[in-house]
């Protein structure tokens, strides 16, 4: 019994302490409310004071400051007395409740507006992120004109591939044990409930194309391979490249392209036989705008080559003229045969400035070595050469 009485006493003490705390919190909240109301009235009076009366002069500023302090102290004292007495005016309480309701209404309206914006933004994001299936994408059922243009660009004159699915692949995958790690496929991910989803990224625009949900990963991987062949052609990275066969090569249609020397077939004659070497045309899809650019590039290259050839001819003519003028001055009349030999040897390779001065070497000289049969001048001619003025 004593234990029960002590417990009851402790319970009573705890209840009294809790009631005291509640009273203290209530008094503090009421004091804060009174201070807030009086401060608001004081601010309103202070702001309305300059409009009702002219601004005070500098001499009376100290009096006004003292008066405002006295008003603040009196407001605080009256608020404390009202709180201690428990007399709260009804109109002020109603005003406080009205202000609280106004703030709560404004906060609720702003919260509803924000929630509505979030919901609308989410709906827009869902509409923007809505993906298309492969059939809709390539058939153009619910797709836009851009999708149709992309599909028409993809179905150009390129090589055609056929993707064949084998039954052995599914049997092999079904024979995998649970301990062995599964193979990861490109463009395939597993759903939480066990299904396998496949999707692919469109290279022509920033969008993902939904390929569907499948029972196993291999079926999803094969669906990805078929879509990748449609999108990227021979540049596609496949999960099962062994299932692809080339059905039709790239069509070689006659296009009005200016044929240049680099694109013409070259002929090489080896041991009396003529072999034609045709240029290799890449199988990748080329844009239509590359043809006029290639034409302009070929034209500019041919023009540059022609100008370079003219410059070389002009430079060689000037060198030949310099040789004709300098050799007689150096070697005199004895060096005429050497000048004729050099001019004749150069005439076979390039045109000269004056063709009349060129004489072919004798047949015996070409057979026995013309340069070895040259006779050097005697002492008299060397003395004449030393006495002759230098060029």
UniProtKB/Swiss-Prot annotation:
GO terms for cellular component: nucleus. Negative regulator of the abscisic acid (ABA) signaling pathway involved in seed germination and in responses to stress conditions. Probably acts as a transcriptional activator. Binds to the GCC-box pathogenesis-related promoter element. May be involved in the regulation of gene expression by stress factors and by components of stress signal transduction pathways. The keyword Transcription regulation applies. This is Ethylene-responsive transcription factor ABR1. Residues 45-64, 88-160, 247-290, 332-391 are annotated as: Disordered. CDD domains: AP2. Induction: By abscisic acid (ABA) and stresses, including cold, drought and salt. Triggered by YY1. GO terms for biological process: abscisic acid-activated signaling pathway; defense response to fungus; ethylene-activated signaling pathway; negative regulation of abscisic acid-activated signaling pathway; response to abscisic acid; response to glucose; response to osmotic stress; response to salt. Keywords: Abscisic acid signaling pathway, Activator, DNA-binding, Ethylene signaling pathway, Nucleus, Stress response, Transcription, Transcription regulation. Belongs to the AP2/ERF transcription factor family. ERF subfamily. Ubiquitous with lower levels in seeds and siliques. Gene3D superfamilies: AP2/ERF domain. The keyword Amino-acid biosynthesis does not apply. PROSITE patterns: AP2_ERF. Residues 130-154, 252-290, 378-391 have a biased composition (Polar residues). It comes from Arabidopsis thaliana (Mouse-ear cress). One of its GO terms (molecular function) is DNA-binding transcription factor activity. Residues 184-241 bind DNA. InterPro entries: AP2/ERF_dom (IPR001471), AP2/ERF_dom_sf (IPR036955), DNA-bd_dom_sf (IPR016177), ERF_plant (IPR044808). It is found in: Nucleus.
